[in-house]
Amino acid sequence: MIVDVLANSERIEGLNPYFKVVFDYIKTHDLSSMPVGRIDIDGDNAYLKIEDAKGRKTEEAVYERHDKYIDIQMPLSMPESYGWKAQSLLGEEQAPYDVAGDFTFYRDPVEMVFTLSPGEFVIFFPEDTHAPCIGEGVIRKMVAKVRRIEN
């Protein structure tokens, strides 16, 4: 997991060939004024989703993780909190991995929580199980999906 401010994104753009195109797009567009939906940057290799997510309490949050994609998440309208837990520490899955949706959900209670404000981002790699959308009200946010590259 990486947490940083948008101004520092150049430091990590070399970690994946699609990071640079995603961050260039984020920096040159007013995402908060865009309609909810998917924005293709490089087809299924890199795309954004603008979402209006209903905030939830920490005890209602559900851990998720992905195998094919890396998530870059950034709140646009207000602070958003996230739970995090290493994949190696997870307990029982709620259901088997959904190949089409690229997600697995877990029953573990959320314990470690951090909060981001607009202009800050988090990168969740496949080993980073996360519980997004912790907060109050409707949270406008951006979720970039970046195809994982095997080394």
PLM ranges: what are they?
Residues 114-129:
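Conserved metal-binding segment of the jelly-roll/cupin
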Residues 68-80, 86-88, 95-102, 145-147:
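Short, conserved beta-strand element in jelly-roll/cupin
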Residues 121-123, 137-151:
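A short hydrophobic beta-strand segment most commonly corresponding to one strand
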Residues 2-50, 57-65:
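A short, N-terminal "cap"/entry segment at the start of jelly-roll beta-barrel domains
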Residues 43-45, 65-69, 75-77, 98, ...:
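Short connector loops at helix/strand junctions that flank enzyme active sites
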Residues 43, 59-71, 89-93, 109-110:
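A short beta-loop-beta micro-motif enriched in histidine and acidic residues
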Residues 48-66, 76-90:
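Conserved short histidine dyad/triad with adjacent acidic residue
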